[in-house]
Regions:
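Auxiliary Fe-S-binding modules of radical SAM enzymes
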Residues: 2-62, 130, 136, 267, ...
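Conserved, mostly hydrophobic/aromatic
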Residues: 45, 68, 106, 145, ...
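Conserved short loop/turn motifs at secondary-structure junctions
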Residues: 53-57, 94-95, 147-151, 254-257, ...
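N-terminal pre-triad scaffold of radical SAM enzymes
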Residues: 65-116, 120-146
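Helix C-cap/helix->beta junction micro-motif
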Residues: 71, 75, 168-172, 244, ...
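Hydrophobic faces of well-ordered beta-strands that scaffold small-molecule active sites
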Residues: 88-94, 143, 174-177, 208-210, ...
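Glycine-rich, proline-tolerant flexible connector loops at the mouths of alpha/beta enzymes
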Residues: 94, 146-155, 218, 291-292, ...
């Protein structure tokens, strides 16, 4: 007798075909899992506890992937007029880093510079216009705007930048400024956090990325980024932003000094926040990229990435969208991830400066993304930040 997860996996194999088999990531069938009652509850759509998540983490990868794929289907059943499980979405945007000057010196970051370094910079309006002209020329509709914690830029610099972008490029959503940046702004501007976020929104900010989350466990954060916003501060920014009508994404960067239990605690904090505010549009996880950083850690492989993405999809039962991280894993693993809980292929990513400095250098055009999605058995569709179809 086979457990239900194995039966689901057999069905997935038939749908996937040979495209992932050639990558060596589709394992052989395993013996009956001792966690059948738990997996049956997962299939039934029940919420799992952190302890149960740890048990599921140790399932054979193909069984966990089958459960994640099933939970993806449950989450997407009513999306896009009932066609949510027939499509995979993506967006055309550009990641623009307005400055690389930063005074928090995260050990996992290869991007930051001090003010005195020759290659430090602060973007000009002319440079921003050039980048946005290039973005709109290829059909781009969003800019991911983030930067270092610059110790001297005042609020007027940011508000002028946002106002300029909104007035000149009104159809481009500004998906900008991570929670640690907002925490930094409140300190530098000497203003209440809510006032800062409100003024940024009034100037043109449309949504907030989930960057800077890393692992929302302070014992971990104190080791990898002791000068950065702590876990409660990160979540507070999101709580305020959601209350002001700004949606955001949520992220996890793993594979450094944290434990599996830390990862699950991180997911638990995101789930509780989503229960309270409902403001997260999607979850994205990726693995630590160690090249050129001060943090020494053995890189985790693609199997571990797929395992954590699958577990995240099962655990985060109140998130509709999970994004594949092809930027760090490569196009083929990004494709396989579509059967491990992901329903979105992320962004064409015209420009990316942070993880590329740490060793991830994958690039894709929109046609390549669409081909990968079709090969996986889905229909590609373009979306905006709110997961509304735009094609």
């Amino acid at each position: 007798m086979q457990c239900v997860a194995q039966v689901l996996w057999k069905s997935d194999v038939a749908k996937i075909g040979s495209w992932s088999d050639s990558l060596g990531v589709m394992p052989t069938m395993t013996s009956i899992s001792s966690l059948e009652s738990l997996t049956d509850r997962v299939i039934g759509g029940e919420r799992i506890t952190p302890k149960e998540a740890l048990e599921l983490y140790h399932l054979p990868l193909e069984e966990l992937g089958a459960l994640a794929n099933h939970r993806r289907m449950l989450a997407r059943t009513d999306a896009v007029d009932g066609k949510g499980n027939e499509i995979v979405t993506y967006i055309i945007d550009r990641n623009i880093n307005y400055t690389n000057i930063c005074n928090v010196y995260c050990k996992f970051c290869a991007f930051y510079r001090t003010e005195k370094e020759a290659d430090s910079y602060v973007i000009t309006l002319e440079e921003m216009d050039q980048k946005l002209d290039e973005l709109t020329a290829v059909g781009g509709i969003q800019v991911l705007l983030q930067g270092g914690h610059h110790p001297k830029l005042g609020i007027d610099w940011y508000l002028d930048l946002l106002s300029h972008m909104r007035e000149k490029y009104p159809h481009v959503n500004i998906h900008g400024f991570s929670p640690p940046e907002f925490n930094h702004f409140a300190e530098v501007f000497k203003m209440p956090l809510e006032e800062v976020i409100r003024r940024f929104k009034e100037a043109g900010l449309g949504s907030i990325p989930g960057g800077g989350g890393e692992i929302l466990v302070d014992s971990v954060r104190n080791r990898i980024a002791p000068l950065k916003a702590n876990s409660d501060q990160w979540l507070k920014v999101m709580e305020i932003a959601h209350g002001l009508g700004l949606n955001s994404s949520a992220t996890m960067m793993f594979g450094h000094v944290e434990t599996v239990e830390d990862r699950i605690e991180h997911l638990g904090r995101l789930r509780r926040q989503q229960d309270e505010t409902g403001g997260f549009t999607a979850f994205i996880c990726w693995t630590f990229q160690p090249e050129n950083t001060k943090l020494r850690a053995e890189p985790v492989g693609s199997a571990e990435y797929l395992r954590m993405q699958a577990l995240s999809r099962v655990f985060l039962d109140n998130f509709t969208n999970v994004q594949s991280s092809w930027v760090t894993q490569g196009p083929k693993i990004g494709q396989v991830a579509l059967r491990y809980g992901a329903n979105d292929f992320g962004s064409v990513m015209m420009e990316e400066n942070v993880v590329s400095k740490a060793g991830a250098n994958f690039r894709l055009e929109s046609q390549e993304i669409e081909n990968l999605i079709r090969e996986a058995g889905y229909t590609p569709r373009r979306r905006n930040n709110w997961y509304e179809l735009v094609d």
